[in-house]
Regions:
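GST-like domain detector, emphasizing the conserved glutathione-binding G-site
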Residues: 1-172
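Alpha-helical recognition domains of nuclear gene-regulatory proteins
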Residues: 21, 73, 212-215, 219, ...
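GST-like fold's C-terminal all-alpha helical module
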Residues: 100-260
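Acidic carboxylate-rich catalytic motifs and surrounding loops in phosphoryl-/glycosyl-chemistry enzymes
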Residues: 33-34, 230-232, 281-284
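Long, positively charged, glycine-interspersed low-complexity recognition regions
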Residues: 235, 239-293
Length: 293
């Protein structure tokens, strides 16, 4: 068997997305909360960003980075019984891309797609697989950038967010928790302002968040409970994971009040808690194909 550890922040939407995937599919893992300032829990690794997943099997430990890549690799591992994670990593090559800021960075261009060696699956190009990958990309490329400007919109909201998450986490009642709460809220309040400018958001950043949530529910449509049909697929889990970081905060209450997302959100939450995501085996693809035939 494998031992999986997830190193994460309570307040990070990429981390909640990864955690929701593991929970949705009943994958056992150890959840390790990293202090957002000191990060001593990650001193074993040269990589200092979260989420970070370590996979230990037969004495070998592999590090998986990037939330969407983690999800795709673990999903692909489950549906490819004869392939190990090291082999799968080779199927997700990194390439150098230049961002809008002119800076070069390493990116995995196919990270929103699953790998399969079976000929019938490898050649299938159907609307459901494409739709899932496109909305996973949307969650990473657009939706996630609306979270910090909304959660940390004012200093009061920033403090509310850190106060709540510190109380929920393992740093509650410690001096590390106090540092995280006060320094973290001040830092993120400032970062939220810069992100609003960087991503050219409306002066009232809530409006962009409302539009995004309604766009998502419109894409699902009235004929489906989830984008995955009767069960959440990886797009559902990704969008839910990003939004769930706002739970119990003012921004979350406003979203439920001003958009149509409430019904989908709580059905997805229940499915994740019940390990009710689409089964990651060959039946998974049968379900996808059946929706387009």
């Amino acid at each position: 068997g494998m031992t999986i550890k997830l190193y994460q922040y309570q307040t990070c939407p990429f981390c909640t997305k990864t955690r929701c995937f593991l929970l949705a599919h009943g994958i056992p893992f150890e959840n390790i909360e990293v202090h957002p300032i000191f990060k001593k829990e990650m001193k074993f690794s040269k990589y200092k960003k979260v989420p970070l997943v370590t996979v230990e099997k037969n004495g070998e430990v592999l590090e998986l980075r990037d939330s969407s890549l983690i999800i795709s690799i673990l999903s692909s591992y489950i549906i490819n019984e004869g392939m190990n994670i090291t082999e799968l990593l080779k199927r997700y090559p990194t390439t150098t891309v230049v961002g809008e800021d002119g800076k070069s960075k390493q990116e995995t261009l196919n990270k929103h797609w699953l790998i399969s060696d079976e000929a019938d699956l490898a050649t299938v190009e159907n609307d459901a697989r494409k739709e899932e990958a496109e909305w996973r990309f949307w969650a990473d490329d657009y939706l996630v950038h609306l979270i910090s400007p909304n959660v940390y919109r004012t200093y009061r909201e920033a403090y509310q967010a850190f106060d709540y998450h510190v109380k929920q986490g393992r740093f509650n009642g410690t001096w590390e928790g106090v540092v995280a709460k006060y320094l973290g809220s001040i830092a993120m309040w400032g970062i939220a302002k810069r992100l609003k400018t960087k991503y050219k958001l409306d002066e009232n950043v809530r409006l962009d968040l409302y539009k995004a949530c309604n766009k998502w529910t419109e894409a699902i449509g009235k004929g489906r409970t989830f984008m995955g049909g009767s069960k959440p697929n990886l797009a559902d889990v990704s969008v839910f994971g990003v939004l769930s970081v706002m739970e119990n905060l003012d921004s979350f209450h406003d979203v439920l009040t001003h958009t149509n997302i409430k019904k989908w959100y709580y059905k997805t939450k229940q499915a994740i808690e019940d390990h009710g995501g689409q089964t990651l085996n060959h039946k998974y693809y049968d379900q996808l194909v059946s929706k387009t035939c």
